[in-house]
Amino acid sequence: MSTERAIFAGGCFWCMVEPFEERPGILAVTSGYTGGHIEYPTYDQVLSKASGHTEAVEILFDNELISYDELLDIYWSLIDPTDADGQIYDRGANYRPVIFVESEEQRIAAQKSKIALEKSGIWDKPIVVPIEEAKTFWPAEEYHQQYYKKDPKRYQAMHKARERYLALQRFKGKFKFLRKNTR
């Protein structure tokens, strides 16, 4: 087994855990904060935007069972990559989408994946997700961990709303793409 780490930010971390955690080869998914200037930030500090942190998930995975490229594919399916100022209902820099890379190999894979998404025509606006060097990852408070199991009704409502929003955004992008090609 060869363990690797990936860190992705994509809005509220509650909706980022389950889609990764249920995959074979995923060893752990932790909700937390990264990219800020305060050690051991709390949720309230991050929410207030005073700490400079972004909500993110840290994924430990067995790269012999699931690849970083597969994780990138999952990540892109969970976010609106055209929105740099948060995701869905969660607005502000603390909810911005970011791919935090651990190595040059991850950086190259993330860049290739981003370019492929741009060329796909799925989205009608530019892909604006930055690829940044991984910084210290601080686990969030325990009540945030595996939230989808702790409050399944609330999680499902948020998750379904997020899925509907993303489906609508993708549809709008495809519709505009098709209209451009028929003129």
UniProtKB/Swiss-Prot annotation:
Its EC number is 1.8.4.11. The keyword DNA repair does not apply. InterPro entries: Met_Sox_Rdtase_MsrA_dom, Met_Sox_Rdtase_MsrA_sf. Keywords: Oxidoreductase. The active site is at 12. Pfam families: PMSR. It comes from the Bacteria. The keyword Oxidoreductase applies. It catalyses: L-methionyl-[protein] + [thioredoxin]-disulfide + H2O = L-methionyl-(S)-S-oxide-[protein] + [thioredoxin]-dithiol; [thioredoxin]-disulfide + L-methionine + H2O = L-methionine (S)-S-oxide + [thioredoxin]-dithiol. One of its GO terms (biological process) is protein modification process. GO terms for molecular function: L-methionine:thioredoxin-disulfide S-oxidoreductase activity; peptide-methionine (S)-S-oxide reductase activity. It is an enzyme of class 1 (oxidoreductase). Coiled coil: none annotated. Has an important function as a repair enzyme for proteins that have been inactivated by oxidation. Catalyzes the reversible oxidation-reduction of methionine sulfoxide in proteins to methionine. Belongs to the MsrA Met sulfoxide reductase family. This is Peptide methionine sulfoxide reductase MsrA 1. It comes from Lactococcus lactis subsp. lactis (strain IL1403) (Streptococcus lactis). The gene is msrA1.
